[in-house]
Amino acid sequence: MSLIKMLFSDLDGTLLYIPPRLTSGVSPENKAAIRRLQQHHVRFAIATGRSVDFLSRTFDPELVLDTVGMCGASIRLDGEMIYQTDFDPDEIESLLEVFSDDRYERRFLAVTPDNDYVFEDPQSEAAQEFRLNRSGYIQDYRNILDLSLAEYIQNPANPHINSCFCHFDVEEGVDYYKDMLKRRFFNRYQIVQTSPYSIVIMKDGANKGTGIAKIAGLLGIQLEEIAVIGDSENDFEMFAMIPNSFCMDHARPDIQAKAKHIVHSVAECIDFILQENARQRLEELNLL
């Protein structure tokens, strides 16, 4: 392992994992480990499917960190937004056409740069169920707009769309529409599976891995000097791109198989990195 200069952590099921809840908060153990990491001059950052300010806004206002948000659709570095993907209205129209066949029940929505949600049909049963949030899931949006997505894109004054999400009632819907999108658009869009039942659609090849690479390039850090930790499907791209990858031990076996190391917590990952960094420095001094 190279000397690690930066660690990117997923949120749900990773940094925010306090058993048995995947999204509970930053444990005292993890918070103390982050401080140790930073004291050793290793940057701690976030790579998440959530918005860039979800962590500080929802859980801890002190944790304003470099963030690859929305699975790579938006990036914040040193407190500044440095990148956001941007769908033109005609591109949204084409996506709506793909999802118009009603082959599988779904909830299709788009996200604006202000983190407002725009549903394909805001009056649909799926949209109403999302608003009710019976499961108590910690949601991440500023407002749910009353306009339909088709109405929203007709107004040129509205901000362009950052990314699109689609959640299906059955897993078969994911495979069906992923195939449809790839055949229709010939890899024009990045389609990232975020769970067995959902996908996010983005432009410019955006994903967690490419977002991390953008930050690394700006900071002058090599990919071999970065570590990543996650637990779900939307971490596959960063596991593939970053050699020093860690997966949470509660993740499914097929997800764990994508990573190099398996750990129980972010704190365990950090301790491993600090130990390896210490060993690397001793080797450089020819003391090992």
What are these regions (language model features)?
Residues 55-58, 181, 255:
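Hydrophobic packing residues within well-ordered alpha-helices of enzyme cores
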Residues 3-8, 29-42, 181-185:
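A short, Lys/Arg-enriched amphipathic alpha-helix followed by its capping loop at the start of a domain
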Residues 107, 112-229:
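Conserved acidic, metal-coordinating active-site core of Asp-based
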Residues 62-63, 71, 185-187, 241-242, ...:
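Short, structured coil segments at secondary-structure junctions
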Residues 4, 41, 64, 161-162, ...:
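Short, well-ordered alpha-helix to beta-strand connector turns
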Residues 2-6, 15-17, 27, 199-288:
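Mg2+-dependent phosphoryl-transfer enzymes with acidic/Ser/Thr/Gly-rich catalytic loops
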Residues 28-132:
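Active-site phosphate-binding/coordination module
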Residues 44, 106-108, 191, 245, ...:
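Hydrophobic beta-strand scaffold residues
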